[in-house]
């Protein structure tokens, strides 16, 4: 029998990827302050997301999850307004969701890596530059990106700043998705100016025309579109990696409608990273006791027996929608490793959402020294992921992307054929390279073709047997 869970039982377990704070008393005071703050999300919203993901796990939906690699307290470009960046991200995200919904004829569950993605695991605890060694940048919630001793010192006050930024971002997102901006009648207005000249823009315009015609037909038939909230707004959920557990513990509250149930109110969904998914460690211990839907990042080092053990710990009731397996294997390894993983999970009857993260396994260093991700490798992993699920008879249920609504140049390739030469003026990420708006929409149309082909295959009647 596992030990009775409380919000702080994780503190008795081994832990990785958490910084050493010089002032423990200051950290404890900040965590106490956070515990008195209002929740960012509500348990009922997390339950709604879990229900929607449960339908995805059963093959009745698709998960679109994406956003910044790491959010920043200050925008990387001084002339960018934060509100505009949030709006532009949402515009691209809504475009992608419309493309996928239309192609798959399935509801698309929309989950952003936003309003809380401020902490990042690192492969090395220190970073060297010009002969000087300092602690690695671990995200704005922990320390600063500037390469100096003061900035790189973990600062507890940053936890409060992260809460405030998350609250402001979430408030703006709620206003956009429920205040009319996400109205399907605005489908044409979501296109960003610099995307209008892109090779995929005419495909999106054609799709927008078909949607507008369908809405016009429905109105002509007497349907009052204003009385259907599902056409005027959408459900949009937030997520981030559950990495800085002191922050997550402070944001965990008992569900007032279901005593004894605990919800981490920093986001609707949390995930456990590839570097922190050890079954007997702190991050798994914390996550097993909260009711939020959870993701598990599965990289090349993931072993099937360990994965099954994680599923037993984190989802002992085998609840649909509780677990999303976010596979980040790389274009070269996904075809070899994913089939065995799928078979192991299916053999045990585990209900999960299978999601493809084609970003993290395809990171390289360019000739000019920039960290980048070739777009063709990203596409290759996505194609192989869905091909494996088609071959195994399982549902490839989603994608998990690092992306932005900005006109950056961080991933090479795509319709505009971005190269190293473009990085000099348009490389703005504080951590890992992201798909820009055009590349994100390019990927959505590729996914649309894969989902449409899958839908056609499922709908095609089997040939009648001879003699029947």
Predicted regions and their residues:
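N-terminal ordered "arm"
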Residues: 33-36, 43, 56-92
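Non-transmembrane, aqueous-exposed alpha-helical and coiled segments at domain scale
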Residues: 316, 322-354, 360-409, 466
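N-terminal basic/disordered segments at the start of proteins
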Residues: 1-64
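Short beta-strand elements
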Residues: 66, 312, 343-345
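Short loop/turn segments at strand-loop or loop-helix junctions that form parts
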Residues: 64-69, 111-114, 356-359, 402-404
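Active-site-facing alpha/beta catalytic cores
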Residues: 70, 77-330, 373, 381, ...
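Residues at beta-strand starts and edge strands
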Residues: 58-60, 105, 292, 350
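A general structural signal for short secondary-structure junctions and capping/turn motifs
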Residues: 52-56, 99-101, 286-287, 388-392
């Amino acid at each position: 029998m596992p030990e009775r869970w409380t919000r702080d039982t994780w503190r008795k377990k081994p832990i990785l990827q958490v910084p050493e704070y010089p002032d423990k008393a200051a950290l404890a005071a900040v965590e106490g302050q956070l515990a008195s703050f209002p929740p960012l999300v509500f348990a009922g919203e997390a339950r709604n997301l879990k229900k929607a993901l449960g339908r995805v796990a059963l093959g009745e939906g698709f998960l679109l999850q994406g956003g910044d690699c790491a959010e920043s307290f200050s925008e990387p470009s001084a002339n960018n307004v934060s509100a505009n960046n949030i709006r532009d991200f949402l515009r691209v995200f809504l475009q992608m969701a419309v493309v996928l919904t239309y192609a798959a004829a399935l509801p698309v569950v929309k989950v952003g890596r936003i309003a809380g993605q401020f902490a990042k695991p690192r492969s090395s605890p220190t970073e060297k530059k010009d002969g000087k060694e300092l602690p690695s940048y671990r995200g704005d919630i922990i320390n600063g990106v500037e390469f100096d001793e003061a900035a790189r010192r973990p600062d507890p006050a940053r936890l409060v700043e992260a809460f405030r930024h998350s609250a402001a971002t979430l408030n703006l997102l709620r206003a956009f998705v429920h205040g009319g901006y996400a109205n399907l009648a605005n489908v044409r207005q979501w296109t960003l100016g610099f995307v209008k000249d892109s090779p995929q823009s005419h495909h999106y315009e054609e799709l927008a025309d078909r949607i507008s015609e369908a809405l016009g037909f429905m109105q002509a038939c007497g349907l009052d579109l204003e009385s259907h909230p599902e056409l005027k707004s959408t459900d949009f959920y937030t997520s981030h990696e559950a990495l800085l557990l002191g922050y997550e513990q402070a944001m965990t509250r008992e569900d007032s409608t279901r005593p004894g149930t605990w919800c981490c109110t920093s986001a609707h969904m949390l995930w456990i990273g590839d570097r922190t998914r050890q079954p007997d460690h702190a991050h798994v211990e914390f996550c097993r006791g909260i009711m939020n839907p959870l993701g598990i990042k599965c990289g090349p080092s993931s072993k099937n027996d360990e994965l099954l053990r994680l599923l037993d710990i984190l989802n002992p009731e085998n609840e649909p929608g509780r677990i999303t397996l976010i596979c980040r294997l790389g274009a070269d390894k996904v075809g070899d490793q994913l089939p065995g993983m799928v078979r192991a999970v299916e053999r045990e009857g585990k209900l999960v959402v299978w999601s493809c993260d084609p970003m993290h396994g395809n990171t390289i260093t360019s000739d000019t020294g920039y960290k980048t991700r070739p777009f063709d490798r990203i596409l290759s992993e996505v194609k192989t992921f869905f091909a494996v699920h088609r071959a195994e008879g399982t549902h490839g249920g989603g994608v998990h992307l690092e992306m932005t609504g900005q006109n950056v140049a961080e991933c090479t390739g795509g319709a505009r054929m971005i190269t190293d030469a473009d990085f000099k003026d348009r490389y703005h990420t504080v951590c890992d390279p992201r798909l820009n708006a055009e590349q994100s929409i390019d990927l959505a149309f590729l996914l649309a073709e894969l989902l449409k082909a899958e839908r056609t295959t499922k709908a095609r009647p089997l040939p009648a047997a001879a003699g029947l």
